[in-house]
Amino acid sequence: MRTLWIVAVCLMGVEGHLTQFGDMINKKTGTFGLLSYVYYGCYCGLGGKGKPQDATDRCCFVHDCCYGTVNGCDPKLSTYSYSFQNGDIVCGDDDPCLRAVCECDRVAAICFGENMNTYDKKYMLYSLFDCMEESEKC
């Protein structure tokens, strides 16, 4: 419980994009957004290595790969525009980089929603020391 409180305090100062991504996750999963995924498995959260532990972790692997294709802005810091229309996430930027970041986040949020049945609490706050297998290529 103490660790969850520390993560919550750390996220309180987060502005822009990460709160937007968390909002998308919340809408698609009904969970606490980023808090549910911040240190999940080998790929959710900062960094990422090894083999994705389940379909939920694979969503994060694909998200990391998507961020790797974004050029012209920092995916983790850029603020984009989006809306929810009839339950769908709609990215609304004209700027190609901001639209690409939004699309990466949109696809990941949908993936989390579609794979909620694979979410396993044993992968919450997962140690990267358990992620020593050779990493897959994007």
UniProtKB/Swiss-Prot annotation:
Annotated binding of Ca(2+), by residue: 43, 45, 47, 64
Subcellular location: Secreted
Expression across tissues: Expressed by the venom gland.
Cellular component terms (Gene Ontology): extracellular region
Catalytic activity: a 1,2-diacyl-sn-glycero-3-phosphocholine + H2O = a 1-acyl-sn-glycero-3-phosphocholine + a fatty acid + H(+)
Gene Ontology terms, MF aspect: calcium ion binding; calcium-dependent phospholipase A2 activity; phospholipid binding; toxin activity
Disulfide bridge positions per record: 42-131, 44-60, 59-111, 65-138, 66-104, 73-97, 91-102
Record text on cofactor binding: Binds 1 Ca(2+) ion.
Family (UniProt): Belongs to the phospholipase A2 family. Group II subfamily. D49 sub-subfamily.
Annotated protein name in UniProt: Acidic phospholipase A2 MVL-PLA2
